[in-house]
Amino acid sequence: MNPSRDEEASLTETARYGVPIQPASAPSTDDVSLTETARYGVPIQPASPPRAPPPARPESPRKREPVRVGETDSLLREPVVFNPDEFTRHAAFLGGPGSGKTTLALNVIEQLALQGVPSILVDRKGDLAGYASDAFWTATVGDPRRAMRQTALRDRLDVALFTPGHPGGRPLAIPIVPDGLDALPDFDRQQATRHAAEALAGMLDYRQSPKDKSCRTLLAQAIDQYVQLTRESVSLERLVKFIGDKDPRLVNAVGRLDVKLFDKLADDLDRLRLDAKMLLDSGAEKLDMDLLLGRGAHATAGRTRLSIVSTKFLGDNNNVLFWVSQLLIEVTRWLSRNPSPTLQAAILFDEADLYLPATRQPSTKQPMENLIKRARSGGLGLMLATQSPGDFDYKCRDNIRAWFIGRVKEKVSLDKMKPMLSEARVDPAKIPGQATGEFHVARDGRVDRVKAEPSALATEQLSDDELLRLAARTRDSGHLSS
């Protein structure tokens, strides 16, 4: 969304770097949008005390600043900016290794944090956890814009690093079914219990055989009936007993389904209970959106929570998919209780093709598609980044407004992207030759060639030992405020 000529008159030179600022004097509401020092992504303190408003005049809400993603790759070098609320319609960052897609996504996350919008980063490789490292905050940065952003973030961020699946860091215990489903409308409850059943079925390695399909159906019915019968949390132990005892209400709900399957499913769940103790560690902090977003009792005055969830310690993909599916279900439930007309939080999924692939149906796919559709009304922005854009499910593109398309060289990936590129009026021949940080930004049928702004964090993969050490430090302090 490039500003019009009239709008440019109200944007001073430094607005080009998309940072929330404080006025040096008392400007009008229109003048507040962007000023010189906003260019560097830093909240600027006034040079002299502003004139106090009349006592009877109510304080107007703080106006959010546009998020600067870069500038057009043209002679004019016009800034390319987004209204923060546009991200409630989601964004996809596509590009191969070295394209700069992750630093572009983090640039957006950082600017939102400076405006008080918390974020969750779901990190598969360990290269998003640098915000928890002392090296990031003490490093000398040559680029003055990045240096000023780094300083601003130091004063504003509240970093929490989680390592689900490993007690040596900061584990997060997930419920096999989120609490509070009994309070949801029937459709929402049944959808959530079905998603939870699919996640458990993935952990049990159930496939598409008739017997496995019947077990999936029985599992979904068991969870749905249990949450209606009691307000107790659904645990594997309780679920095993409920199914193994062939509760009359459950038997009635499944109709003519073979009752022999009850024993098989109960045995399978009991084995999972023994195998997945670390994953479901009841002694760990509980997965809770207020914890991840730094709200309520977890809030730190004057700071914005940035939670990094490292999935490196969860084991194989089935475990990762199960854990992330539970996160997606919890996020959806939280949104239904905390709707917002404006952006209130963001979640970045790195290598999102694992969760939303084009051809497979992992346990994360339906919850992710459901969240993409529903997050806008809840004020949540989803950011999906992937190194394998050809494997990404483009069927969701109608619900994703902004597409940041970086360098992609693989012919197979380009061929799979052609329908989307054609719809966005992007010439596929130009994609492989883009340099690092160069993107085609497509939104609402409009395309800009953009040179992206870098994030303050230069991503670097941390070792497992370093991740655990940093996570334990945020656990012991409750957070890391640099």
Give names to the regions the model predicted:
Residues 173-174, 410-419:
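Conserved AAA+ ATPase core "coupling" helix
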Residues 104, 110-118, 126-131, 136-373, ...:
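P-loop NTPase motor domains
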Residues 91-92, 307, 383:
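Conserved beta-strand position immediately N-terminal to the Walker
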Residues 124, 350, 380, 387-388, ...:
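Conserved H-loop
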Residues 161, 395-407:
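A short helix-turn-beta junction within AAA+ P-loop NTPase domains corresponding to the substrate/partner-engaging
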Residues 1-96, 103-111, 115-120, 125-150, ...:
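Basic- and hydrophobic-enriched, low-structure N-terminal and domain-boundary segments
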Residues 3-8, 24, 28-32, 47-68, ...:
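Conserved P-loop NTPase motor module
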Residues 97, 389:
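The conserved Walker
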